[in-house]
Amino acid sequence: MIPSLSRMAVLLLTSGFTVTASGNPHFSADEIMTWSSRSFSGETDYQLIEQNGYKVLQAQSRGNASALYLEQEINLTNTPYIQWCWKVSNVYPGLDETTKQGDDYPARVYVARKTGLLPWQIESVNYVWASSQPIGADWINAFTDRAHLLALQSGGSKVGEWVAEAHDVSADYAKLFGKKVDHIDGVALMSDGDNASVNATAWFTHIAFSSSASLPECPSS
């Protein structure tokens, strides 16, 4: 019997090739909009919009879930930090995010790596804007132990505000999976509300990998 697959595993399995990134990979909103899309339950509506002179990606989930993803090998030895800016319209109060019924997030960014040739041999870290779990909390995905979630933001205190993030992917894999890794094989983002039939809008811009832990410059809220 094939073990349950994480959503990131499904994304990587839909592509037949891997591109290796050179330099410091940086993805503008225009570039993210060209990434492949994968539906899990209906379609999250992705659009390019302008906010305060910045072009950003808007993701509207109305009780559905689809992701934009890129399969690309990224060298974490040279660029271990992932950076991005995000904003959400609301959170989902009352969800137990450690359960299958509560596995919904107004915004999430994934990184993943292949650990073998078999389809389920993929490990992913999900950076999420949590509704109930506190900032800094981490937990195993309810659908598979090959996906770990890490709450970078939580609750409504910063709803409607742009927030800059920078996280050491190598350190997070060491903490969550107990192993040192030197590369990942894919990155993705999503706003989803399919399990609990909830709605939210998220905005993303400036996804990049860097040797520096410095925060990106976000649009003004």
Language model regions located:
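Bacterial N-terminal signal peptides that target proteins for export
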Residues: 1-9
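Extracellular/lumenal carbohydrate-interaction signature centered on repeated Trp-anchored short motifs
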Residues: 71-82, 156-159, 180
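Extracellular beta-strand elements of beta-rich domains used
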Residues: 187, 207-209
